[in-house]
Amino acid sequence: MDTVTLDSIDLKILRALQEDAEIPIAELAEQVGLSQTPCWRRVKRLSEAGVITKRVAIVDPQALGLRLTAFIAVRTNQHNERWLERFARGVAAMPNVLEFHRMSGETDYLLRVVARDMEHFDSIYKQLIEIADLNDVSSHFSMEQIKDTTVLPVEDAAGLKPRRGVR
C-alpha cells in the first residue's frame, strides 16, 4: 500500500466528497482549484491508499419505517478472545445493529440498533442475548436525534498519526 501525505487540496477533496460522494469530477476539480485529471488522480490515490474506504447512499431510517433507535450497553464476565470472536460474529450478522464498539469503563460493548417499534426491538434484543454469555444488558432509547453526520473533521487531519499507509 502506498504512503500518502495529505495536503490542503486532499483535505478539500475529502471534505467535498463527504458532503456529496456523487459530485461530478469537473465540479469537484473546480471547488478544489485543480483541473479534472489531477483531481481524479488524487481521488484515485486516496481510494487506493485506504483514506476513502467506500462511497454509499445514506438512507433515512424513518423512510424505511425504522423509527426506534436504541443504544444497548453490554457487560460480560468473559474477556477472552474466543468469546469475543463468537460475540462479534453473532452481532455482525444482525443487520439492525448499525454500530458495535468495545468500550472502556463500566460498559464492555455498546451497540446502536434501529427497529420499527418496541416489539421489533424486543426480537432483536432476544436474538442478541442468545449469542453469548452476557452479564448485564441495558437498553437506552433515543428520544430525539439532535445531530447526525458522517462527515469527519478533515481540519483535524494534521494531528492524526499514520494509519493504513497514510502519514
Regions found by a protein language model. Name each.
Residues 1-167:
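A compositional/biophysical signature of low hydrophobicity enriched in polar/charged and small residues
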